[in-house]
């Protein structure tokens, strides 16, 4: 896994892994490369990441992921 240089916070492999899984699962759902790159844009702080969470039924864990995005 390559470190995203758009992320300016703390490098935490576990948090990156959690965020990356959302984007990977979303890509697997849609099989669209735009979804994969847009999900990761701006260090996961974007509307596509949130839409992916909704589509993957992860909104009950939104606060956990929002904190992770703020940290990384």
Swiss-Prot record:
Listed GO MF terms: neuropeptide hormone activity
Disulfide cysteine pairs (residue numbers): 7-43, 23-39, 26-52
Keywords: Amidation, Carbohydrate metabolism, Disulfide bond, Glucose metabolism, Hormone, Neuropeptide, Pyrrolidone carboxylic acid, Secreted
Transmembrane region(s): none
Residues found modified as Valine amide: 72
A Gene Ontology term for the protein's cellular component: extracellular region
Tissue and organ distribution: Produced by the medulla terminalis X-organ in the eyestalks and transported to the sinus gland where they are stored and released.
Gene Ontology biological-process entries: circadian rhythm; glucose metabolic process; neuropeptide signaling pathway
Subcellular location: Secreted
Chain positions with Pyrrolidone carboxylic acid modification: 1
PTM remark: The N-terminus forms pyrrolidone carboxylic acid in isoform CHH-II and is free in isoform CHH-I.
Sequence similarity: Belongs to the arthropod CHH/MIH/GIH/VIH hormone family.
Function: Hormone found in the sinus gland of isopods and decapods which controls the blood sugar level. Has a secretagogue action over the amylase released from the midgut gland. May act as a stress hormone and may be involved in the control of molting and reproduction.
Record's protein name: Crustacean hyperglycemic hormone
Species: Cancer pagurus (Rock crab)
Higher taxonomy: Eukaryota, Metazoa, Ecdysozoa, Arthropoda, Crustacea
């Amino acid at each position: 896994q390559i470190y995203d240089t758009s992320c300016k916070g703390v490098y935490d492999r576990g948090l990156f892994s959690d965020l990356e899984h959302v984007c990977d699962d979303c890509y697997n759902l849609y099989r669209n490369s735009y979804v994969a790159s847009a999900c990761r844009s701006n260090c996961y702080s974007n509307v596509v990441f949130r839409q992916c969470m909704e589509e993957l039924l992860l909104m009950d864990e939104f606060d956990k992921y929002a904190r992770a995005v703020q940290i990384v």
